[in-house]
Amino acid sequence: MVPPPPPPVDAHPHRLFPTEDPPSPLFPIEEKYREDPDRLVGDGGAAPSCVGHERRGLLTDDGENGECRPAEIHEDEIPPLPALNSSLVMLVVTSSAAGFLFGYDTGVVSGALPSIRHFLHLSPVQEEAVVSSTVAACFLFSLIGGHANNTYGRRPVVLTAAAIFFVGAVSMGVAPSFGWLVAGRTVVGAGVGLSSLTAPMYVAECAPSAVRGRLVTGVSAMITVGQVTAGIVAGLLTGKDGGWRYMLGLATVPSAVMGIGFFFLPESPRWLAASGRTAEASAVLTKLHGPTPTAAAELSSVLAAVEFDRDPAHPVGPLRALVSAVSDPPTSRALRLGCGLMALQQLCGINTVMYYAANIYEAAGFGESAAVWLSAATALAQAVGVIGSMLLVERAGRRILVLCSLAGVAVSLLGLGFSFRMARVSSGMVTVASDECSSQPALVWSGITETCYDCVGINECGYCGGLCVEGDETVVFGDDACPAEAEWAFDACDNPNGWMSVVFMVLYLLSFGMGMVSGCLD
């Protein structure tokens, strides 16, 4: 008896769809459209641990030990870089504006706070409210943004965020009081929360696969560009009449750029496909990618992902999806690693340093103008760290850069704390204090005005020749008079160790910048 001939061998056994029944000859899903060989992949075949990866159309397990394995990609299978067109350029510019807005808001508040404190006579608690109101609103609206994105689409959410940010920036620029300023900061936080969540998602769903990772990372990198720009603007406007209003109000420019840009951009193809508008999704991908096979493959991947989400066997809704991800070992490990890195980045104090950089430098002994310019310089150090990380990540590896970043952050924070201890030790002693300046409101110290460091920490109080009395930036109030040879210190005390604070602040932000991008790329 002659044995039957063997079945034909499929050249691509790990296709998302079986070769004998492809969904359409126009949209083949091939392994060559994968862009990152370092990702763990699988198609939900023999290995239970690979279930769920088929939505990306990637390879399956190795067939031996039931684990996902990296995809093997030949050099000639890497998708070519897409040709630039007006839609792609608009996508890059407008998505970058979202990151720029976030960075500008962070940096400009640091430079504006010293001027706002003197103009509106803010207490330390009120200063904290000016900063934290934006952060709280950002957190709340980032949670709301997920539902809004799924319901209304990415484009309307970003347009709404741009409009909200514009209104908030105008409100801050004309704020006549503390309450008005906090309200404007809260409105801005709502815009930041919506845009910072939606813009990277929109880029990931619209950008060609060959440059998708770079564009998404670019949105994060633009945060540092916004911080540096804000520092320069604050330095130029510090000391000018109403300068802090212009600092805050100029945020209308990038918000207008983002709003106008997204007005002319199409909706996300992923959202269109999920809404049953497949023809529109195809037209959007063709517009962004050009009429190439890559556009067809991208549409096929989008349709496969949408079909996966609609499958009753797969979890629907954020809670069920999270439970499913946590119960899947490879996904759970990746989730713990990613969330852990992000938590470490936030817990190391980056928000405190960025929002209060100018205040920190004032406490270290620098005047208002010098403190604002130094905060711009340290923001530039973070930008250098980000750029250096992007250049070195493929050579040194992500793990090495993240470990070096964390070590540098730890050393710099310890050094920064030591430098402030030295500043207090070397501060001039108070021999006489007026009734208005005889107590330190901060609970960090003993509650007694003992040093120049304590004195200048009290609103409308300054130090000269052992006296702690009321005054302003230039003169002493009342009958108190400084000794002729004494120098009036209102914003900061003379500190021979101030250079230490500068060194450790620069090291801190340089180290953080290295880990900021490396952690995201990991």
Model-derived regions, located:
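Alpha-helical transmembrane bundle of multi-pass membrane proteins
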Residues: V2-H289, E307-D522
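Short, well-structured alpha-helical segments
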Residues: A295-E307
